[in-house]
């Protein structure tokens, strides 16, 4: 390789600041080194909420972001997952009590498909019917929350505790609860992906009708 080629390669190497979405105040999440912007596109980065807010008490909340746009010196991201640390969740489990969870897939008002996983911890052992009733409350309130919120607002409701508080307030009338959390929220599909899936489903349905 000529000296000129080596010099050109070195000059293209640069640091890129990794930037959080607007709802996280465009905070800098970190930095990465690359010789080609395309090598950064699609990368994921996991940080804690405490890394963003500076509050160590929020280090149990893990956030995952994915690079979806790269400029000359910055890599911008989208939110793809919120998850509570396993050690924290294990600390909430008590012998002789119930742990009730659910996985609920919903669609927000701006057509993002998201899965949320709330979990409730009772003070003592609940019976099967009580567990089912609490799970039903979880499903209903998560679906209601999605029906009223954009993707960004639903993320805020999960991370800031409004959703878990709403579940706690209603479910505790069924059986005494010690704590409710949203242990995980995952982006499953963006609006354009949802639209493409629906269009494909319509095409399949029309083909079935034509065959009949």
From Swiss-Prot:
InterPro entries: Ribosomal_eS1, Ribosomal_eS1_arc, Ribosomal_eS1_CS. One of its GO terms (cellular component) is ribosome. The keyword Ribosomal protein applies. Coiled coil: none annotated. GO terms for molecular function: structural constituent of ribosome. PROSITE patterns: RIBOSOMAL_S3AE. Keywords: Ribonucleoprotein, Ribosomal protein. One of its GO terms (biological process) is translation. It comes from the Archaea. Pfam families: Ribosomal_S3Ae. PANTHER family: 40S RIBOSOMAL PROTEIN S3A. Belongs to the eukaryotic ribosomal protein eS1 family. This is Small ribosomal subunit protein eS1. It comes from Haloquadratum walsbyi (strain DSM 16790 / HBSQ001). The gene is rps3ae.
